[in-house]
Amino acid sequence: MEGNKTWITDITLPRFQVGPALEILLCGLFSAFYTLTLLGNGVIFGIICLDCKLHTPMYFFLSHLAIVDISYASNYVPKMLTNLMNQESTISFFPCIMQTFLYLAFAHVECLILVVMSYDRYADICHPLRYNSLMSWRVCTVLAVASWVFSFLLALVPLVLILSLPFCGPHEINHFFCEILSVLKLACADTWLNQVVIFAACVFILVGPLCLVLVSYLRILAAILRIQSGEGRRKAFSTCSSHLCVVGLFFGSAIVTYMAPKSRHPEEQQKVLSLFYSLFNPMLNPLIYSLRNAEVKGALRRALRKERLT
């Protein structure tokens, strides 16, 4: 490399500090979780594409959420499983940086898609007469494309700042994958600016969207309480509670990981929390939506019935 930057070539990822038998068990569990993530989100995406009754803005964005969850998990889980099965857990420097970039980008996309989904529920419940104009297919397409493009552009900012740092060791990160705060500890230079940018990005992409979601749902709650029909109120609560569960899991774990004072959460606890945030959320999202959503369950039953008839 040019200039005074020194680059390490390989990075060592720590192994789980457990015996061989438990390591095999963990490998099996993580493989099962990853398989459930692929199957669950794949089924959600497939049902939404195939069932014309689900061709609505809400399920359009839910299909994007399924794509994000599959991409998010596929970014690091296969490498983590490979490291569990091998004696040496290493990753080259630039693939590690790319893993960090994709980790941030997909997390940003999920934040924005969840905000758009809350706006969709707000428009549907609070402004039903204007819903078709507020959430036309053109608007939905623009919101979806903007969420993806903006998220990847935002993830480029910390990536460029990371690549401007010299990396001369140590060669081991104290994390199970290339998480950005752990990667920064490999730099042999002051990372103050990087940490400030990461915190500012967290405020912008976590706190800001979360406030928008909460405001939307306060308005939604007030509108639901005014609904006269018990069936209509139940359906609205069911749909919104599913979305709130996903929002709580995602934003809650992310804010604790990246914005809570580090003294209150030791590094080992943060590793476990980050693992939960990155491994379990993508698996739980389709379960939450399929178990609590009558329309998704109905579409799944129709698909299974059609399969049996053929």
From Swiss-Prot:
Membrane topology field: Multi-pass membrane protein
Signal peptide range in chain numbering: none
GO biological process, alphabetically ordered: detection of chemical stimulus involved in sensory perception of smell
Entry's Gene Ontology cellular component terms: plasma membrane
Extracellular side: 1-24, 79-99, 158-194, 259-271
InterPro entries assigned to the protein according to its UniProt record, in alphabetical order: GPCR_Rhodpsn (IPR000276), GPCR_Rhodpsn_7TM (IPR017452), Olfact_rcpt (IPR000725)
Residue ranges that the UniProt entry lists as topological domain Cytoplasmic: 49-56, 120-138, 219-235, 292-310
Cited CDD domains: 7tmA_OR2A-like
Entry function: Odorant receptor.
Protein name: Olfactory receptor 2A14
Organism: Homo sapiens
Lineage of origin: Eukaryota, Metazoa, Chordata, Craniata, Vertebrata
Gene: OR2A14
